[in-house]
Amino acid sequence: MNDDAPARFRWLPPGLRPPVEMVWRQERIFLLVGVAALFAGYDMNVYGLATPQIQAGLHIPENQIAPTLSIFRTAALAALLIASSADLIGRRRLLLLTIFGQAMFTLATAFSGDYLQFVGAQLLTRIFGYSEEMLCFVVIAEEMASSARGWANGTLGALDYLGAGFASLAFLAVNVLPLGWRALYMIGAVPLFLVAFLRRNLPETKRFAAQEKIEIARSKIAETTQLLRELIRQHPLRLLIMMIAAAGFGFGTAPAAFLSSDYLQSVIHYSPLQVNLVFIPGGLVGLALTVRAGRLSDRLGRKITTIGVVACGGIAFALFFSGISSWYLGPLWSLAFFGFLCGDALISGFALEIVPTRYRATVSGLRYVVNIGAGALSLLLEGRLYDHFHAHGRAVQLLLCSIPICLIAILFLPEPAGKKLEEMAA
């Protein structure tokens, strides 16, 4: 099909399709990026869902559950180096590497013989997985129409959300699968290898290709060292405010999102089936809300939509971990996880819309590292707070106090909705 042929997005329900006309090239790129987000959402949520089973199989103490995830999150530092190199060698080449690396080490996780091997395999999985996520949002920012970037960011987050839903469905059989939790990682690796094969047809983004022609004669080594200096010199305030917002969001939401499944099983005493009866319907609602919120941000603006979504998630998480055990848990989970995933998607896209093309992969990596690093610190503190309170709920509620910092920071960012990327970068 010709790249300039009209896009149809028939693989999406009518109400979730883009609000403006797009071409086949844009649909193809979005599909190849979005499918990877779908299966990455599955992969990254297995540990949180199957925590009790993995904990029992690898003999992990209760106060080390959250700190273990904080160890995983140090992978973001290596991921930053990989993602930043996309500003030098291109988005396409790196995306081919990251999806294959994530698939390979997801499969390796299933064969972990002990705790150290499990941590090592998951560290490598997340190095490539985090790099993948950083680059996906860069591609979306550079290829989608200005009036559809909010929709694209929201839909990408929704696909990640849908992947988490598939993980919940697979988790339903964790006690009957031949290899238990290990089978969940095997299941997740197969489609990632398939996406890696299909991604051979992913084209380079037009904006990077144009930038590359201008910069082709410059030393790549010199470019690497100067990139961050130029970024800090040209956009210091934007960069600082964006990183404060990312840190506040990551610090507040990381323990809440990760410990939800364990909390339901260990504190509320839900079975895997009951956990799925909360997660799956809530996930479907959250999926629709995430796409709607992305489209809403194109009309009302990124700032007001992001503030509303993040505030909704923070309040819902605080109530979810309050100790109530009733039908309220389902709606609260839906709103909380919607706020977490949609908020992350909107903030990710926000960061890339306010800087020039040559810095986008670097800024995406910086935001991701700050978000993941703040979350890692929060998860470490959660382990200490658990020792003090002897309960995850109160620890999580205390750590949610950073959400207002994120909201205040977003107020001071420029509004990118409906504007061309070149206009915002000026």
Task: Give the label of every model feature segment.
Residues 59, 90, 111-117, 145, ...:
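Helix-breaking motifs and short loop linkers at transmembrane-helix boundaries and internal kinks
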Residues 70-84, 280-292:
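Central cavity-lining transmembrane alpha-helices of secondary-active solute carriers
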Residues 120-158:
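Cytoplasmic helix-loop-helix junction between adjacent transmembrane helices
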Residues 148-176, 367-379:
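Glycine-rich segments within core transmembrane alpha-helices of 12-TM secondary carriers
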Residues 1-42, 47:
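Cytosolic juxtamembrane N-terminal segment immediately preceding the first transmembrane helix
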Residues 297, 301-350:
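C-terminal transmembrane helical hairpin of 12-TM major facilitator-type secondary transporters
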Residues 78-115, 297-300:
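Conserved MFS/SLC helix-loop-helix module at the cytosolic interface between two early adjacent transmembrane helices
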Residues 47-49, 235-287:
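Extracytoplasmic gate region of multi-pass secondary transporters
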